[in-house]
């Protein structure tokens, strides 16, 4: 039914799993731009947006079993970039298995936004029973996190 559903990314910690889930979530609205603007007005909007992104990340991090207050600070590139690199490395290792591995990669688009090229309607999760498969966008929890 889902040929790639049995694939499991190895050597990823909850921080990377939560980050990937965040990118899946944010890709539906164009991705996340971490570049700081130069004007004061744009900087204020950027900081507000980054607070919301960090809050979403904390909620997702908690879903993976982490303590929200211990979630890595994504605004710091020295923390975020190695996490993205590790996710990419693990995805590349599955290049022979995944149909089009580039679609799964976190990439910067022409606007400078980091996103994953998987349509939200194709993102699913299974419930308690492995046969219960739901679209991520239909999840109430996913919608609450997205609304922040």
Residue ranges and their predicted role:
Residues 1-148:
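Intrinsically disordered, low-complexity protein-interaction/activation regions
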């Amino acid at each position: 039914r889902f040929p790639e559903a049995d694939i499991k990314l190895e050597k990823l910690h909850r921080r990377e799993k939560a980050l990937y889930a965040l990118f899946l979530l944010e890709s539906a609205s164009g991705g996340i731009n971490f570049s700081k603007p130069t004007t004061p007005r744009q900087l204020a909007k950027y900081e507000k947006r980054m607070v919301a992104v960090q809050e979403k990340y904390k909620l997702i991090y908690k879903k993976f079993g982490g303590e929200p207050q211990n979630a890595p600070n994504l605004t710091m590139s020295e923390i975020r970039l190695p996490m993205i690199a590790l996710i990419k490395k693990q995805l590349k290792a599955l290049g022979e298995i995944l149909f089009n591995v580039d679609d799964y990669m976190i990439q910067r688009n022409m606007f400078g936004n980091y996103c994953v090229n998987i349509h939200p309607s194709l993102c699913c999760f299974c419930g308690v029973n492995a046969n219960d498969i739901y679209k991520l966008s239909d999840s109430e929890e996913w919608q609450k996190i997205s609304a922040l």
